[in-house]
Amino acid sequence: MGNHLTEMAPTASSFLPHFQALHVVVIGLDSAGKTSLLYRLKFKEFVQSVPTKGFNTEKIRVPLGGSRGITFQVWDVGGQEKLRPLWRSYTRRTDGLVFVVDAAEAERLEEAKVELHRISRASDNQGVPVLVLANKQDQPGALSAAEVEKRLAVRELAAATLTHVQGCSAVDGLGLQQGLERLYEMILKRKKAARGGKKRR
């Protein structure tokens, strides 16, 4: 499994006539459920996966309310500690970051917080929209999206960084549609702002 893509449909697709695909990178600690989320999006079913040693990539088309779909090139990068220094190689020039956390494993949220802040503050990622997926909401004791947002100190990310925290589950697909809609909206907003800034110069 790997080297594919899934597409999404836009709410304002007419604004993006020139994009073949939006580049999105999925990162997070090991065992957070990144690959399972990727394949839930692609195959619309839960796929039990093994730890990612490098990366997976899929083209994903997801209806976001518009009549025309938008293709997302989604890169899922391994989260083991030894692989984390490689994240920046994948996030360079990305349109959006998806940071996945295991909401049922509260003891690792501090570690996740450190990695989230490190990657979002990297020079190449300044201002890139961040969608945090609080995965495994199907498990007993999973923290809510609001609690995950608080523990990760998401609001302390750079003021120019658009963020959204969404509870979700790779098992039943809960919350994924809403999360992707918000990510798409944030990407659109950033591109519009960038275009407006160029016109004013």
Curated annotation (Swiss-Prot):
InterPro entries, alphabetized: P-loop_NTPase (IPR027417), Small_GTP-bd (IPR005225), Small_GTPase_ARF (IPR024156), Small_GTPase_ARF/SAR (IPR006689)
GO biological process entries: intracellular protein transport; protein secretion; vesicle-mediated transport
GO cellular component terms, A-Z: cytoplasm; nucleolus; plasma membrane
One Pfam family hit: Arf
Main location: nucleus
Keywords (A to Z) from UniProt: Cell membrane, Cytoplasm, GTP-binding, Lipoprotein, Membrane, Myristate, Nucleotide-binding, Nucleus
An annotated Gene Ontology molecular function: GTP binding
Gene3D superfamilies with a match to the protein in the record: P-loop containing nucleotide triphosphate hydrolases
Complexes and interactors: Interacts with CYTH2; the interaction is direct and ARL4D GTP-dependent. Does not interact with ARL4D.
Function per UniProt: Small GTP-binding protein which cycles between an inactive GDP-bound and an active GTP-bound form, and the rate of cycling is regulated by guanine nucleotide exchange factors (GEF) and GTPase-activating proteins (GAP). GTP-binding protein that does not act as an allosteric activator of the cholera toxin catalytic subunit. Recruits CYTH1, CYTH2, CYTH3 and CYTH4 to the plasma membrane in GDP-bound form.
Family membership noted in the UniProt record: Belongs to the small GTPase superfamily. Arf family.
PANTHER family in the cross-refs: ADP RIBOSYLATION FACTOR-RELATED
Protein name listed in UniProt: ADP-ribosylation factor-like protein 4D
Species: Homo sapiens
